[in-house]
Amino acid sequence: IVMGRKAYEDCLSSLPEAAEKRFLVASRTPRAPEGRVVFLSADVVAEVLALKDRPGKHIWLFGGGELASDFIRADAVDRYIVGILPVIRGKGRRLFQEGIPPVELHLDRCTVSDGIPILEYSRRGR
């Protein structure tokens, strides 16, 4: 699981099966590993793409619009899973940063968990 530092600090305890996963956390400040958590402070996208070429399971990018935008710019996202929280805030941050290229998606699945719609998309043409 790859996540930004803020998402890591906010959500780690609520992630399912967190104890069984390996976490890569993007952080501007270098830190020593903590158990199954490795902090990445250099070129996070390049480090994760190097892992993608190795045998193993899927890489999951969790939370962090800035981090997700970096991976979208690198054309490194195969699937998108987006949860929509049922809260109207009136204003807020964008999900993704401005300036990322358009990506055409196909809705593969829609489920609802505890009142939260979860939309699963694949890239069109891949």
Task: Give the ranges of each region predicted by the language model.
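Enzymes that bind and transform nitrogen-containing heteroaromatic metabolites
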Residues: 1-126
